[in-house]
């Protein structure tokens, strides 16, 4: 690419600095459309119109002594740079280059600028307009200068050889920096690359106030100069990386700069840094597409970088090496930069002036964004940038996190990606406590600290830090409250929803927002809440202590009038919401340490503490529902005297129905309420469901109900039922939330999972039946195979069959409960309670014994239960594995005894009214009798008759499945026998090898081998007989017919070491080969039946039975007989080349059956 020739216009601009023209000079003209060129290599530009020159690599540039490098921009105020006329001087180095040293006494930093011009380089050769002619560049508004009638400006130009430290500042007589004058007469700062430029405003320029500090450069006050900074919106394509480019003054306010793509080949001619602008009008808005900075990806391996070194200038060479390493290391991070999409953002690019260790263009590391909610009311901001030290991996601790008040506007610190890499390496924790304390102390009206949106990889570390400082944070919130804010203090953690996962340490969070309210009583001095809340720590921690500490231990309240109210608002994501809801009941069962009673206080029935549990479910509840959980204070010694009259006058417990639809629908129910008791029980005043539905759950509820009548009746049986029902998905997903909720992989309900959905007893039924009551309740119990059994009525006998684990836990809970009562009640009540506990324990143990005796190995079973005083058969989707007739008889006997007991318990008038009861009962007994006889005889017609007459469609399918399984078992047994015969043939195959060894061994050895083989065969036969007999004793047994019992009778045949062939019992006529088999009676221990072995009619019956799925061998399976013509053993049934007649008898049967079906 050839360089253009210099023009006289550019030569006029390039004069020494001493001849600079002030901006007030009317002779200073803006640059024309002509090309600008360089006058001489060592010259300095005239301070006219300053246009940004971007270095560009070409082959002509390789002769430069100083290689081009990316610029580092600084936000420097004009007063900071040009404060003193004596601070700036122009020196000339040994090599003839002019160096401009800038000194600022107030800021204590020095900046050196080395200027070099190439031999013949046009200053705007890099500024090209695509699709347009270069002659008309001044007519384009994208790069044209808007002039006004009142002021004019000059240009100062930068050469591409500018060093990293080089800052081009030019002083004039009025100590003002030369700016590009906008159309609104607003001066602009030096337009370096990647520097933040001031946005154009319509107010005149008065003065720029210097606010440079130790580690930050601050823009001036808006009230003084009405200057605000902005960052360009860079449209980032999906497949192309982009960079944030500062918005120069010669772009419009609404203009945006987008970076489409950049050449990745660093050595190509397209790798130079230049700007390509395209002006497009869209709704009076212009977009300038700027070519990306590709030269920043420097590599030391480039030949032009190695050759180009500046003589006698060590600083420039050092800066070159450092930046080459910096950009080479940060190459992948530059391609993944985010773009700013808002106009009202303040971007501060800060560079440490004392070193070159900070990468300005890496926006993820080096600058943060402060967002202001109301831009018009914004005050002057102290901008800050997180700096990174090159050698140490730790972030600078002196970085100031500033939280500014802006007339009620809440500032948001958005550091999504800062401090992420180094925190990951060094595992340092952010001091969240200090950050939140600054925010709380800086605000008086609204105490809300929005925690920085954390990076996803650092969520664990952040949560651990927050959990560690939780107590201190709550104390800080409480101490910072003033006056009217005591009732509205809150500490809010706002974190992204991406961080909330159940597996993360956020599982320890149960409640996100805590509201601390003073007591409602008039005397607030006695009601101080000091140590209120700790987060529920349910994972791998003591849950009881954490829940007890959650409720306040406020001891200095006035018990008679004070009411403690704690609002717990849940506004977290779904996983934490689920954890909270699953632990509600566990939280409610541990309210023993809620309060304590002072020594000289008499308990009254009205003096109670109300704990208001305020739950907010954004998805499920439209309105905020509250549930008042009432608990009367308990103290074993202080309440003993006061509770005696209460126990005598009224019942021990009185249950109430909370939900009207709980009998019909058992979901969303918290049906346990108690009232007027002296024990730790709860009451709900409003009919509001505490536990709501979820998308993935049907039921999440945990209720304990204890029903008992008046304690004056010593014969009353205390009925305490603890039934377990829990959703399997809930157990798997949220089982670890609490120690009481133990997770099991199968979803099996362990002994600690409880749900009771029970209804209150009917008093009228209790009066009619007396002590022999029938408790109506619906129970859904989950077995190991998740079989649902609904029991809608149970007789008076308490032998309820359910899991042994439930029995043991219920016994322990009964004992614990009555031990609690024994501390408060009198001795006579203690004796009554002990007797009742014994009765319940005996009934439970009896039910456990019944459960042990009736172990039926089924996944699902037929249940016969009473329903509305009538017995009916309801089948519950069963496929049984093994059913014994003896067990069925035992169950039927228990069933008959239960019906007899039920008839004896019910009044005679009820039995007389139910006329259909005996009919249904007789029909049920008849069904049972027919079922037993059908099983014993093995008659299929019995099942068909039962199915046609009495059974329903569901029961009919069950009977068919049962019959199919019975036939399938027979087929499996036949296969087992077939494999045993094949194993015997393998043993016989050893005879062939032994016959081959007779040449080497004597006849005695051959005889010994034959004797051993015969012994092995006999042992196999004996084992088969034992196995078949044991099999028929256990499985076939009485539930198989006599025809089935006669099957599979083995007939042992002593052999002489030769291969045996099975008896031919499947073809209707003999063939010529069948005459070759030996049929002597000596070879058989048991003779064949007297009737002929081969009858066509019998074969037809056998084949018909086989087609139905059975295996009917009336003559049994005899031992294989040897062939007369065979001189050596034959592997029958195992060779691939074997014929059909050489196969196993079982295979012959199957082949013949298939042929018959085909015909």
Curated annotation (Swiss-Prot):
UniProt organism field: Homo sapiens
Residue ranges the record marks as coiled coil: none
A Pfam family the protein falls into: RAD51_interact
Top-level division of the source organism's lineage: Eukaryota
Annotated tissue distribution: Specifically expressed in meiotic tissues. Highly expressed in testis.
Region (Disordered): 1-35
Quaternary assembly: Interacts with RAD51.
PANTHER family with a match to the protein in the record: MCG1037962 (PTHR39229), RAD51-ASSOCIATED PROTEIN 2 (PTHR39229:SF1)
Region Interaction with RAD51, annotated ranges: 1111-1159
Name used for this protein in its record: RAD51-associated protein 2
InterPro entries named in the record: RAD51-associated, RAD51_interact
Gene Ontology cellular component annotations, sorted alphabetically: protein-containing complex
